Amino acid sequence: MGENMIAIILAAGMGTRLRPLTNDISKPLLEINDVMLIERMIKNCMNESINDFIVITGYNSQKTDKTCEDLSKKYNINIKCIKNEKYDVTNTSVSTFLATDYIEKNDFAEDFILINGDNVVNPEIIHDISGSVNSAIVVDNVKELNEESFKLIVKDGIIEAIGKDISIAQSSGEFIGISKVINADLKDFNEILKRIIEEDIQNYYDFTFKDLSKKTQLTYVLTDGLEWTEIDDMNDYKKAQDMLNQLEN
């Protein structure tokens, strides 16, 4: 892997709420304005001098593998694909660990950025988190929250609670599914993540940051109104199209 940072992109999920669009492909292979979500995100990362990627595949992995192979040639970058063989019964915690454990076992010295593969963002968000000196998570401090939002409560720099079931009134904002872990925190991150997986293989990796915030200085990178969305269903897909039409045209 390279000098700077590694970007981990999670692309294992089945995207059932987007069928028939995802009958044959994982969500990150969906196109908006003739560009796949994964290609757009890779380009956002390349703008921050990130040229090393780990993509976690699962559902329809052959197509994702082929796409990554094509993109690595097109942009002259390194993309390592690792398959989550249990993609249909696990969640993002297991997918994330496949990547972060690989980084630790190979003694890579880089920090990593962790990105949900169905995220569509204003590129400034990637710029802001890339520049963080500490481990960091991106928090939307503006959006009106709902039951589905991955909310968190932050007090004195520590995450007191994180999850969907937090009261909207108490919440400090929504975790948008983009984070950074510096190499010095990698061991702690992996130990916490492992424990979370042992508790429940259906857990989200997001919970890792609660305990990590007690062990290290976490930075909260605020969106301050910068646009983003994750694509879970057709409404989100439409929202992402509208957002990109404004950002890219």
Task: Please give the residue ranges for each predicted region.
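Conserved alpha/beta core of the MobA/IspD/sugar-nucleotide pyrophosphorylase nucleotidyltransferase superfamily
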Residues: 3-5, 174-249
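Short catalytic helix/loop segments, enriched in acidic residues and glycine
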Residues: 24-40
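N-terminal nucleotide-binding beta1-loop-alpha1 segment
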Residues: 1-23
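Short beta-strand-to-loop acidic/aromatic patch adjacent to the donor-nucleotide binding site
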Residues: 107-120
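Conserved core of the sugar-phosphate nucleotidyltransferase
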Residues: 122-198
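A structural signal for short hydrophobic beta-strand segments in well-ordered beta-sheet cores
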Residues: 29, 152-154, 220
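Active-site glycine-centered loops adjacent to acidic/histidine catalytic or metal-binding residues
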Residues: 13, 118, 233
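Conserved N-terminal catalytic core of the sugar/cofactor nucleotidyltransferase
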Residues: 1-9, 35-110, 199
